C-alpha cells in the first residue's frame, strides 16, 4: 500500500519534516525573494458573508502561526461573496505575481476565474461540477461521501435503501446521487419542504395507515377470543401503534438542519424504529443540536476526522475567543498543503505537486487531489446518547 505523503500542520509535525533543513537554509531564505511563498486569500470579507469569511481567514492565520515560517506571506482580498468581486480581487492578486490562492468559498464565485492566468485557486466549495481548469474543489464533496457509504453499506449488508430528498436547493445533488446509483437504491422519493406536509408524505411512504388498520383489525379479532394465547397477544398489541414491518432496511436522506429533523421525526411518528431501520444522511459537520432529538438517535453520516476537528476548534477558540465555522478547518489544511508542497520542492511552489498520486493527510483526514477535486477518505459516525461515535 502506498505510503501517504503527510503535510505537517501542527507545529511539532512541521519540524519533523526536516527541521535541520530549515535551520541550514534560514539565512538563504531571507536572502532572496524567490524563497518567499506568496499565498493569496480570496474570501468574503465584507457584506452578507463577512463573518464566515473572517472565520476562514482566522483559520489561515492560525495555520500561519503554527507553521512559524516568516517566509510565508499571505495576501487577503475581498471576494464579496460573488463572482464579480472574486474576479476583480483575483486580477489584483494576479498583477502582484501571486501563483496560488486559497478561496473562494462559494461555487458561484468561481464563474469568471477561468479568465485569470497563472493562478491556481484552492476553493473551499464542496460542489465539484463545472470547476474551472485552474481551480480545485477542496470541500467535502458528495462523491467522497457516497464512496465511504458504499463501503459501509456492503459491510453491514443492507440491501433495500430508500433515497429521500426535498424539492429544494438539493434537487440537483439528489438527482446526481440517484443517477449515479452507487448505493443501489431500492426506491427514491422527494418530499415537500413544508414541515406540515412532510409527516403525511412519510406516512404514505411507510404505509403507516395500512399497518395501523392491520393492527386494529387484529385487535378486534383477538377481543372476541377467550383463548389464553390470544389474550396474551392482545396485551402486546395494545402497546403497539402498527402491525407488520416496512419493506426497506435503510433510509438515506439528503437534507440538513430542522428539515432533516422533521423527516426523521415523521418516521418515528410513523412507527418506524431507528433500532430496526438504519438512517443515513450527508455530512452534517457534527451538529450537536441532534443530541436533543430522540428521532436523531442512531443517525449515521460520513464526515472528517472528528478528533482533529475538536482539537482545531479548541485551539481556534483559545486563540480568538470565539467559535470557528467548522468548515474553516479546510482553509487551515489548505495553507498546510501549500506549505508542504513549497517546502519539499526547494522552496518553489508548482501546481503539479498538488496532484501527487500518493495523496496527503491533513487535519480533516486523508485525501487525494484528482480531476480538479479533492477525494477524501472519510469516516462514518452515528449519533448515540449525546455523542458522535465513529463506526467505520
Give, region by region, the residue ranges found by the protein language model.
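Extracytosolic ligand-binding ectodomains
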Residues: 4-392
Amino acid at each position: 500500500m502506498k505510503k501517504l505523503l503527510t503535510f505537517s500542520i501542527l507545529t511539532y509535525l512541521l519540524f519533523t519534516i526536516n527541521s535541520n533543513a530549515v535551520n541550514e537554509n534560514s539565512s538563504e531564505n531571507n536572502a532572496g525573494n524567490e524563497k518567499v511563498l506568496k499565498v493569496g486569500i480570496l474570501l468574503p470579507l465584507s457584506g452578507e458573508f463577512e463573518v464566515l469569511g473572517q472565520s476562514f481567514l482566522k483559520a489561515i492565520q492560525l495555520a500561519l502561526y503554527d507553521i512559524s515560517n516568516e517566509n510565508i506571506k499571505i495576501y487577503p482580498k475581498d471576494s464579496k461573496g460573488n463572482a464579480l468581486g472574486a474576479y476583480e480581487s483575483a486580477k489584483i492578486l494576479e498583477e502582484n505575481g501571486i501563483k496560488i490562492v486559497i478561496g473562494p468559498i462559494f461555487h458561484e464565485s468561481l464563474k469568471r476565474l477561468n479568465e485569470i492566468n497563472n493562478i491556481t485557486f484552492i476553493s473551499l466549495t464542496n460542489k465539484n461540477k463545472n470547476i474551472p481548469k485552474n481551480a480545485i474543489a477542496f470541500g467535502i464533496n458528495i462523491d467522497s461521501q457516497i464512496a465511504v457509504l458504499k463501503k459501509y453499506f456492503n459491510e453491514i449488508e443492507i440491501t433495500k435503501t430508500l433515497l429521500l430528498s426535498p424539492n429544494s436547493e438539493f434537487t440537483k445533488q439528489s438527482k446526481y446521487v440517484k443517477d449515479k446509483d452507487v448505493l443501489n437504491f431500492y426506491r427514491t422519493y422527494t418530499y415537500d419542504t413544508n414541515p406540515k406536509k412532510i409527516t403525511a408524505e412519510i406516512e404514505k411512504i411507510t404505509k403507516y395507515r395500512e399497518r395501523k388498520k392491520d393492527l386494529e383489525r387484529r385487535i378486534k379479532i383477538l377481543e372476541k377470543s377467550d383463548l389464553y394465547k390470544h389474550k396474551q397477544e392482545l396485551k402486546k398489541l395494545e402497546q403497539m401503534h402498527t402491525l407488520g414491518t416496512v419493506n426497506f432496511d435503510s433510509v438515506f436522506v439528503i437534507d440538513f438542519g430542522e428539515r432533516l429533523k422533521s423527516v426523521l421525526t415523521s418516521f418515528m411518528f410513523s412507527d418506524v424504529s431507528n433500532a430496526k431501520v438504519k438512517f443515513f444522511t450527508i455530512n452534517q459537520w457534527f451538529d450537536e443540536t441532534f443530541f436533543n432529538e430522540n428521532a436523531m438517535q442512531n443517525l449515521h453520516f460520513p464526515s472528517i476526522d472528528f478528533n482533529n476537528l475538536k482539537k482545531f476548534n479548541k485551539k481556534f477558540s483559545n486563540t480568538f475567543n470565539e467559535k470557528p465555522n467548522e468548515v474553516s478547518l479546510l482553509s487551515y489544511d489548505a495553507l498546510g498543503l501549500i506549505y508542504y508542497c513549497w517546502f519539499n520542492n526547494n522552496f518553489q511552489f508548482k501546481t503539479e505537486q498538488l496532484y501527487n498520486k500518493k495523496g496527503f493527510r491533513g487535519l480533516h483526514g486523508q485525501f487525494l487531489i484528482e480531476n480538479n477535486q479533492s477525494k477524501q477518505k472519510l469516516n462514518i459516525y452515528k449519533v448515540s446518547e449525546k455523542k458522535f461515535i465513529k463506526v467505520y
